[in-house]
């Protein structure tokens, strides 16, 4: 209950910051955008390719909008297909989203997230976020995850994320992810990226385990 209260306070504080920050000027009257069918295909070093297909519809303009999306994602070689949907609100870089996913035989997840833009000069972008999720595994085991993080992105496709997660009754975990764009097609639809990740349990029964590291080189193509 105490951690839930802390998360609620954090959400309220984040939206207070959002209201205090100046809004970017709008680019015109609100308009209804057409539905967009898109997706991506990314090579996976472990085998096959990670494919995603999504249908998106937004109402608004680039600075102020509501976006709904349904999607399906999976590996072409193995594993079940994850399906889900997202409803997101954005106002000059600040916003919130709700996401529900279902992976047959694995788990169901319902996640709530709020974010605020801290810096954006057209080349560098930095966002802060808070999140909470309710997770149910196929065997019936349920657990919660909540936390906060920072997301950085560069106009050339590079990026990094630092996330602190709390699993009530289990422990806390710190994670770092990075991405370096090595090549992009002229329209940026196809990219070659080097990715890396590191995570470490900082409390709980897994705190004595060594950090987990990962790296990969992936070719991705986005369409839609």
UniProtKB/Swiss-Prot annotation:
Induction: By bacterial infection (at protein level).
Subcellular location: Secreted
Protein name: Attacin-A
Entry keywords, A to Z: Antibiotic, Antimicrobial, Cleavage on pair of basic residues, Immunity, Innate immunity, Secreted, Signal
Chief localisation class: secreted
One GO-annotated biological process of the protein: defense response to insect
The UniProt record lists the keyword Secreted: yes
Prosegment location in residue numbers: 21-34
Protein source organism: Drosophila melanogaster (Fruit fly)
Expression (tissue specificity): Hemolymph (at protein level).
Range of residues in the leader sequence: 1-20
Function: Hemolymph antibacterial protein.
GO cellular component: extracellular space
UniProt family annotation: Belongs to the attacin/sarcotoxin-2 family.
Top-level taxon in the UniProt lineage: Eukaryota
């Amino acid at each position: 209950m105490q951690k839930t209260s802390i998360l609620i306070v954090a959400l309220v504080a984040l939206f207070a910051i959002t209201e205090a920050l100046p809004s970017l000027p709008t680019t015109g009257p609100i308009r209804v955008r057409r539905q967009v069918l898109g997706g991506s295909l990314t090579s996976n070093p472990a085998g096959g390719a990670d494919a995603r297909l999504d249908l998106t519809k937004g109402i608004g303009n680039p600075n102020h909008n509501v976006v709904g999306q349904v999607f399906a994602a999976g590996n072409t070689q193995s594993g079940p297909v994850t399906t889900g949907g997202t409803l997101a609100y954005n106002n000059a870089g600040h916003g919130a989203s709700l996401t529900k996913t279902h992976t047959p035989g694995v788990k169901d997840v319902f996640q709530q997230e709020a974010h605020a833009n801290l810096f954006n000069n057209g080349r560098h972008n930095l966002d802060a976020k808070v999140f909470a999720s309710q997770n149910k595994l196929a065997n019936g085991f349920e657990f919660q995850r909540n936390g906060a993080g920072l997301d950085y992105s560069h106009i050339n496709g590079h990026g990094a994320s630092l996330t602190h997660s709390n699993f009530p009754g289990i422990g806390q975990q710190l994670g770092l992810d990075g991405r370096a764009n090595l090549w992009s097609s002229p329209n940026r639809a196809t990219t070659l990226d080097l990715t890396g990740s590191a995570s470490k349990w900082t409390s709980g029964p897994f705190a004595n385990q060594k950090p987990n590291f990962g790296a990969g080189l992936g070719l991705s193509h986005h369409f839609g």
